[in-house]
Amino acid sequence: MHCERFLCVLRIIGTTLFGVSLLLGITAAYIVGYQFIQTDNYYFSFGLYGAFLASHLIIQSLFAFLEHRKMKKSLETPIKLNKTVALCIAAYQEDPDYLRKCLQSVKRLTYPGIKVVMVIDGNSDDDLYMMDIFSEVMGRDKSATYIWKNNFHEKGPGETEESHKESSQHVTQLVLSNKSICIMQKWGGKREVMYTAFRALGRSVDYVQVCDSDTMLDPASSVEMVKVLEEDPMVGGVGGDVQILNKYDSWISFLSSVRYWMAFNIERACQSYFGCVQCISGPLGMYRNSLLHEFVEDWYNQEFMGNQCSFGDDRHLTNRVLSLGYATKYTARSKCLTETPIEYLRWLNQQTRWSKSYFREWLYNAMWFHKHHLWMTYEAVITGFFPFFLIATVIQLFYRGKIWNILLFLLTVQLVGLIKSSFASCLRGNIVMVFMSLYSVLYMSSLLPAKMFAIATINKAGWGTSGRKTIVVNFIGLIPVSVWFTILLGGVIFTIYKESKKPFSESKQTVLIVGTLIYACYWVMLLTLYVVLINKCGRRKKGQQYDMVLDV
């Protein structure tokens, strides 16, 4: 016992020293700015900090590739499908078409005897259409429905403590005695909805799968996740490959689709190699129910800065599994399609909410670094502090008073994006990943200031994203973007003012003209490809029936 505590203390000290040393090392490399390669007049340079970031991308891609090889080998591993599984669907003001597609995909799941529990966040007349769709798709004679005036934590109007207890027991009994059931309950947020499903199921099943109401599941998605949990008893949770259902509806959804692929099949695949996936996404995830009930109350009652948390449910659920020392995995063999915002403002609000939960959960996650591979510490430091280094770099380049610095920065952003997207295209076997380089512009212009705004408002709670039937009227997310653009515009004006004081040399003019032409041609080429792709694939998608997940 004493030996285990001593080893635990050593691991805590070791991971802490490693993380601090890594951060100090990166900071020192950034400040010193040592250059390996440097041309005359400083038109191009490649330094220690750049070499470190390049090495990170190469190493991350390598481990992702190795994890994908392991996934392919697991196909040959036979398993017995004798474990009980329950699918929990969280619904809130869902688009009827998306909800219908979600439930139709649920009916096509190949895992035998899977139980379906859909909980609707809201019990007003405006929410009844979701229950009607559930009964229509799942079969009125094969499913049950129940309108609950309250939920597990709040009593209904005029309800006593005793009657609230009885209604809670009734809901639990309905869930346990029906293979398919839909419950409408008093509004309380997504975490309240998920809690109802977890609490009502109790320990009656072996594995619990989570799903959002805008998600279409691949028929084999449940089977593939069960395989991962069955192969290793120390794996506590597993997530699948989330693809975009409405990728051709707008430019924002299209860029999100290529970003999703990169996030899951490179970043999370790499994390999975070391058994420390940071977030099992809500649209497609599965947990050991025995673990779930060790922390479900703590998960629901999570507080941050004195306020109860109402967003970041999936990320905190994953962190709770990691806190127990269990591994979390990713499998590309389990797939789904999900809706993503097609409007810029809704997307910005979504990204701000996700960034809030990321930074909050980063602090919580840090307490468990010592229980997992050093890669978990390493990646947390790199991804957690990268935005700050990037902002410092951008401001520094824009206010140095040299037009070439700004142009070089724009070219470098696209070059790095192109290198990453080229590797992703090879791994995926699809040229569409080349558009990932366009997402880098969206990251620099919008996501970067959204991250800073998320930190500044991290204790502000709420559902985070309005229902799909609601028009977005919250424009506050545009404030940080406007401030960021003002800062960049100030840098451009300052640079033009400084450069106008002295004439350009002939060599400088040549470099600027060539750089501008390369940048302009790059954009013309990609935008042309985008228009061609949208016209070709957009028409094909209109008549397509989503009987299975297609990687297009």
UniProtKB/Swiss-Prot annotation:
GO function term, MF aspect, one: hyaluronan synthase activity
E.C. code: 2.4.1.212
Tissue expression summary: Expressed in heart, brain, spleen, lung and skeletal muscle.
Parts of the chain that traverse the membrane: 12-32, 46-66, 375-395, 403-423, 430-450, 476-496, 511-531
Gene Ontology cellular component annotations, sorted alphabetically: cytoplasm; cytoplasmic vesicle; endoplasmic reticulum membrane; extracellular vesicle; Golgi apparatus; Golgi membrane; lysosome; plasma membrane
Modification Phosphothreonine occurs at: T110, T328
Similarity remark: Belongs to the NodC/HAS family.
Protein name: Hyaluronan synthase 2
Native organism: Mus musculus (Mouse)
